[in-house]
Amino acid sequence: MAYDNFKAKIWSKAIDKELERAFVFADGTNQQYSGEIKGLGDTVRILGVGKPTVTEHSLINGDITLSTPEKVSDTSVSLVVDKAAYFNYAVGDIDKAQGAGKVLAVLNEEASQEVANKIDCHIANLVNPDSGTVGLQMFTKTQITNANVMATLDACQALLYANDVSPATPVEMILPPWLYMLFRQAYQNKDTDNSEYLTNGKVARYGNMTIKMSNNVAIKNDGTRDVYYVQIRTGRAIAFASSEAHTEAYRPESSFSDAVKGFKLYGAKVVRPKELVVLPCYA
């Protein structure tokens, strides 16, 4: 890369585009608030209301007499952008002279992957018992085997339906590799023909659920073993907001090299806990 040819806006957009392809946990979140983020510490107010009461009336009893209008409860929550993922790397002039001129572009892609990894880890760990997230629906801690994997996943999805999540609402499960292997062995009718399931960790469909695989599933040792905290959720369960990636090119004073530094601001929060079930499990 020639320093003079560096276009920060283009590189920032390239990073954001790469992030979109790399996200697994962030991919299935509500991201409608991202355009409002300008700086670290920004707060997004996510407006919501409760359900109004609907009363049944029999016309045999005469005309309807309305009571005082109900004040429907406010369910608004705040999402704070309190995280930043950043990078700072350089390529020496000698390396470029030896034919590594495109290495900065490659490093840009690698940096994007690592930023996506940091963001995904943050969202995955919103359900870690140490996260402080309140209102989580925790399924019973379960040892998963070939014999019970399908019944366990079905039971988790049934909890969502019990919370009035519509069967027509898209749901996704994000499994660690070992659990996906058990699922794959137990379920032979996976829909993997569609090329859509080659992106964002998607590996299969099961009913109306999209099955994803990720190494970033939250883990906590319970004193005996590592327990994985699998998310089964709708696209409204977690809100995620981020800024546009920011990049700058510069020449470090201490070396003969071109360097690029950049960051992305973000925040995430469980905003609809009834649309998220957490499965603590182990092999």
Predicted regions located by residue number:
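Sequence/fold signature of self-assembling virion shell proteins
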Residues: A2-N30, G35-T55, T75-V80, Q98, ...
